[in-house]
Amino acid sequence: MEYRKIGDYTLSRFGLGTKRMPITDASRVDRLDREIAAEIANEAVNQGMNYFDTSYSNHKGEAESFLGDYHEAHSSDTCLIATSFFELVDPRYMYVFQKQLKKLRTDKIDFYSLEGVCDLNKMRDIDSGAVDFLFEQREAGHIGCLGFSSELSPDNLRDFIGRYPWDFVRMKVNYYDWFNKDGSARYDVANKFNLPIIAHAALRTGAASALKPEALSILKDANPDRSSVDWALRFVKSLDGIVSVTCNMHSVREVKENASVFNDTATLSPEELNVLEACAKAQREA
């Protein structure tokens, strides 16, 4: 497993997301299957992963509680915790933060981010006082690294980064948006500020494994043995500005298969990037 630095932290380039952990009751997302969830987390550690991403609302808060228990049972180097605040879920940022510390069983959250920063509400967390409060918590030692999850246009992203001394930015990075939208422009903005990027949605929330036949055939013709998920993860891995990419996984098998992409040294060649560009175009036009 390759590792990168953000501040004083050394984190794996592949991280475990907790948005779709296994549950015991299909009608209750808060009924986390903790036994299988622990097996997934253990396999992630076995694969060299140490970055565990959650949020206040994942599984109605049960994901944070699970990671708190898991973190307490393991060393801090084994399990770095990342969580976030989303004002539309609960605007009481002071209350939410204190509750998160309690659920995560810690007095310091390694990575903390503001969720849902987009063009329509880019001033919301600033005007509410949430941003200043969180920087105070970082100064007090209750947050290790502070960032935000961006849905901003490149111009607004440039402005938002320049307002505060952020430690990182989370953004969607995948080959479909890269070649069809402004994914590369947002990536370039963060890089110009030397702001580390933690990527998510590398699989486009599942679309990478549900390609239309015209797009899938392009990948299969180029490499019959490589899955569409492998292509998608390897694309993000090949971007040097990406410090880590998180993926929501719900089985041990999925962890093993996906982590294998980050446990070898291969990145995509220029020719393979051309293949993905053709695939993205075919997916859009099909």
Where are the language model's segments positioned?
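Acidic (Asp/Glu)-rich catalytic clusters
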Residues: G7-T10, N46, G68-T78, Q98-D107, ...
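Conserved, mostly hydrophobic/aromatic
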Residues: I6, L16, A44, F52, ...
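Active-site groove signature of glycoside hydrolases
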Residues: L101-K122
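Short, acidic/polar
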Residues: V29-A44, D90-R105, E151-F160, S228-F235
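A short, structured active-site edge motif that brings together acidic residues
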Residues: D77-V89, F111-V117
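Active-site mouth loops of central-metabolism enzymes
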Residues: R20-E35, A82-R92, M123, L216-R226
